[in-house]
């Protein structure tokens, strides 16, 4: 859930430009769908990048690097020779957001988890054939891709269970795998960063788009199916949370921000079911005004992830100021180069 689409079309009038931006923003923020134990016949296998690349300081740096290195993977991630040890017995599988990749969303956090002693894996899911950016297609099918990848990781590492960390669409997609596709027995801890748990209204833009005949169909074609699936009240969101937003046997943790630019009201990030813990960045560090777009590049958030996955060994997160709106310019530029 990454791209902000800023319409540069001319001659369409202000109304058309505003609608284009509104629907694009509303869609780009929300992503997720259903995962399955078996991958649908004829659906392309997920791309698994293995060309290790350096950590980046922000989304733009990762996008620029990927332009010349489309198979880039976060350093140390997808080492299928990695053997989990007694201190870190469960592999960690990362799931990127919309219009993104394993590298653009995890170039910073991935290596930190590797350095902490975890076996870490990440796929590029939900892309069209030949795509260089992913997480744009039907999330249900993406979840099927993810399920197959979890099976591969468990088989290769001989791990009974894994931990999952999903960002934005990746949070909902992985939660669908856990809750709806029978993935719970294979998962110990699920972590959702900037999770659009109950979708978003994008400061009122989503309800407006939902009232305009054909607007969401246009959005699916111009932005992506996955984006539109995560608007508050969409059929996908209703399906995902029907019967409760958690299932027994899995530890659930969300990490969100009060100033998330894409998920408003921010309370839509929180899970309500048994076994859920909801961490708000500003409750732990009031000076950190990280929002949606900087979430996976905020060192404090990375420290929170380590704390959740390895509470006995992770250092205490260090609170440092982060300015409101950090990361937005980089995402806008990165989405238009």
Language model: regions and residue ranges:
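Flexible, membrane-associating and regulatory peripheral segments of lipid-active enzymes
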Residues: 2-116, 320-327, 333-337
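Extracellular/periplasmic catalytic domains that process cell-envelope and extracellular macromolecules
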Residues: 84-88, 114-115, 156-157, 165, ...
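Serine-dependent carboxylesterase/thioesterase catalytic core
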Residues: 95-96, 120, 140-241
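Second-shell loop/turn segments in exported
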Residues: 97-101, 132-139, 225-227, 289-295
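Alpha/beta-hydrolase active-site loop signature
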Residues: 99, 127-129, 197
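Short N-terminal helix/helix-N-cap motif within the alpha/beta-hydrolase-1
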Residues: 102-104, 130, 201
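Conserved alpha/beta-hydrolase
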Residues: 113-130
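C-terminal catalytic-base region of ester-bond hydrolases, centering on the histidine
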Residues: 248-337
């Amino acid at each position: 859930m990454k791209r902000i689409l800023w319409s540069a079309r001319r001659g369409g009038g202000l109304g058309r430009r505003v609608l284009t931006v509104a629907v694009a923003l509303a869609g780009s923020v929300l992503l997720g769908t259903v995962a399955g134990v078996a991958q649908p016949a004829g659906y392309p296998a997920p791309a698994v990048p293995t060309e290790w690349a350096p950590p980046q300081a922000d989304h733009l740096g990762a996008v620029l690097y990927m332009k010349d290195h489309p198979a880039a993977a976060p350093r140390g991630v997808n080492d299928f020779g990695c053997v989990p040890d007694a201190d870190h017995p469960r592999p960690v599988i990362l799931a990127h957001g919309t219009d993104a990749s394993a590298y653009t969303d995890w170039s910073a956090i991935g290596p930190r988890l590797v350095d902490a002693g975890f076996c870490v894996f990440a796929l590029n899911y939900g892309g069209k054939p030949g795509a260089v950016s992913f997480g744009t297609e039907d999330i249900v099918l993406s979840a099927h891709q993810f399920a197959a990848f979890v099976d591969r990781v468990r088989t290769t590492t001989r791990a009974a269970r894994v931990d999952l960390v999903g960002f934005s669409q990746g949070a909902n997609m992985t939660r669908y795998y856990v809750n709806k596709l029978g993935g719970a027995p294979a998962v110990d801890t699920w972590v959702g960063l900037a999770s659009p748990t109950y979708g978003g209204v994008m400061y009122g833009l989503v309800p407006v788009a939902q009232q305009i005949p054909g607007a969401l169909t246009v959005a699916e074609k111009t932005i992506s199916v996955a984006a539109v699936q995560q608007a508050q009240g969409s059929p996908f969101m209703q399906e995902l949370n029907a019967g409760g937003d958690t299932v027994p046997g899995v530890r659930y943790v969300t990490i969100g921000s009060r100033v998330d630019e894409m998920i408003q009201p921010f309370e839509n990030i929180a899970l309500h079911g048994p076994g859920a813990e909801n961490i708000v960045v500003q409750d732990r560090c009031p000076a950190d005004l990280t929002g949606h777009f900087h979430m996976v590049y905020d060192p404090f958030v990375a420290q929170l992830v380590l704390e959740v996955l390895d509470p006995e060994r992770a250092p205490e997160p260090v609170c440092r100021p982060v300015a409101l709106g950090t990361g937005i310019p980089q995402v806008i530029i990165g989405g238009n180069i």
